[in-house]
Swiss-Prot record:
<dbReference type="InterPro" id="IPR003805">
    <property type="entry name" value="CobS"/>
</dbReference>
<keyword id="KW-0472">Membrane</keyword>
<keyword id="KW-0808">Transferase</keyword>
<comment type="similarity">
    <text>Belongs to the CobS family.</text>
</comment>
<protein>
    <recommendedName>
        <fullName>Adenosylcobinamide-GDP ribazoletransferase</fullName>
        <ecNumber>2.7.8.26</ecNumber>
    </recommendedName>
</protein>
<feature type="transmembrane region" description="Helical">
    <location>
        <begin position="137"/>
        <end position="157"/>
    </location>
</feature>
<keyword id="KW-0812">Transmembrane</keyword>
<feature type="transmembrane region" description="Helical">
    <location>
        <begin position="161"/>
        <end position="181"/>
    </location>
</feature>
<feature type="transmembrane region" description="Helical">
    <location>
        <begin position="22"/>
        <end position="42"/>
    </location>
</feature>
<feature type="transmembrane region" description="Helical">
    <location>
        <begin position="212"/>
        <end position="232"/>
    </location>
</feature>
<keyword id="KW-1003">Cell membrane</keyword>
<keyword id="KW-0460">Magnesium</keyword>
<feature type="transmembrane region" description="Helical">
    <location>
        <begin position="80"/>
        <end position="100"/>
    </location>
</feature>
<keyword id="KW-1133">Transmembrane helix</keyword>
<dbReference type="GO" id="GO:0008818">
    <property type="term" value="F:cobalamin 5'-phosphate synthase activity"/>
</dbReference>
<comment type="pathway">
    <text>Cofactor biosynthesis; adenosylcobalamin biosynthesis; adenosylcobalamin from cob(II)yrinate a,c-diamide: step 7/7.</text>
</comment>
<dbReference type="GO" id="GO:0005886">
    <property type="term" value="C:plasma membrane"/>
</dbReference>
Amino acid sequence: MSGKAGFTPEDPEDSDNRHGSPLFEGIFTALNWMTVLPVPGASVFDRTTGARVMASLPFVGFVFGMFTAIIMWAIGPISGVIHVDGLLVAVLIVAFWELLNRFMHLDGLADVSDALGSYAAPPRAREILADPRTGLFGLATAMLSVLVQVAAVASLVDSTVWWMICFIPVLGRIAGQVTALKNHHAFSPTGFGALVIGTVKFWWIALWLLVTPALAFWCAELISPLSPLTSVNTPFVAGPFPAAINPAWLGGWVAITAVVACVFAALFSRRLSRSFGGLNGDCIGACIHLGASISAVMLAVVANAMV
């Protein structure tokens, strides 16, 4: 995101005319800012652009999930010939997530951890937040968050609900939306935070909280419970879940997980706002990464319960 987003010079006469379709501008600009994908973004950067990007943020998570599903299905036939350890697959998936977003959210988490761990007054904390160097707090927090994700994904890989891995990036980004709700403000008038923080409406989050579990229910109905890594002879046999596994319950658990991640993001954002005198883009990244870690753990609980 750094270097990709910032306010464009104001031109009151044609600023609105330079905006494209809200839907497509939001989606494509979100992919342009939040990933390494060569997707064209908006031509004008203002809070309208920022709002559209934040409204589309979970869609970016679904793109991550789509690529994750492709990775899983590509590894499936290989596992029919040679053993592919679930832990190795988990490492590859989490590494792919980080590479796809240029370690952006992990960097935000590290910066926020250093600043928060300093217990400094807001002015000094903001200086630490802007420091490009990473300290012990940042390194340790980033490492632990990645390890949690790897361990949780490894549990899911060999489970009957392996497809839930694809929802982890989505749930983390819904949590990230909470950081930019209208009751929050950016501590700087410039930069990415000023573009997006305070632009998100609650009903946007509520809509994603309905759509995501519905898609999880659909996946539970249509995708085989057999893991592509453990089903050697028929790695991709489609079929219904056993009667003991209720797809509606799985969709409900995804909804509960999303709500928990959002509640965490709301509480954590309040804490960060008090510590820094406002929020910035790093705070959004930290909430996304930690929200994804929390979601991964909660989904892994389901996987372990079904082993």
